[in-house]
Amino acid sequence: MTGDLLLSTSFEHLLCCPHCKGTYLHQYKYEIFDRAEDAREGNHVVVDGSNVTINRSMEGNPSARRDGLKIYFTCEGCEENPTLLITQHKGQTFLQFQ
């Protein structure tokens, strides 16, 4: 993980905007992908404000073979909308912005 993704303080780590490096990111939407390894279908849950959608599609899963998460943000500093991707592969968990 690079210093570009997190800003470390004494007791916590702050997520940094990949565009302006600001730390004022607001979460507004979440996608959860849950499936058996390499399965074509699984559970796909989208929480967007007060709306919740559940389906079996793995389209948009940031992980090619396993579970994945997407957290959508808006940034106060530059008004961009970065998406944090959380994926796993062979026991390792990866964080990256899209």
Region spans (language model):
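Short recognition patches in nucleic-acid-associated and regulatory proteins
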Residues: T2-D4, F11-C16, G22-G68, T87
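Short cysteine-rich clusters marking metal-coordination/redox-active sites
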Residues: C16-C20, C75-C78
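Short, compact, well-ordered microdomains
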Residues: P62-Q98
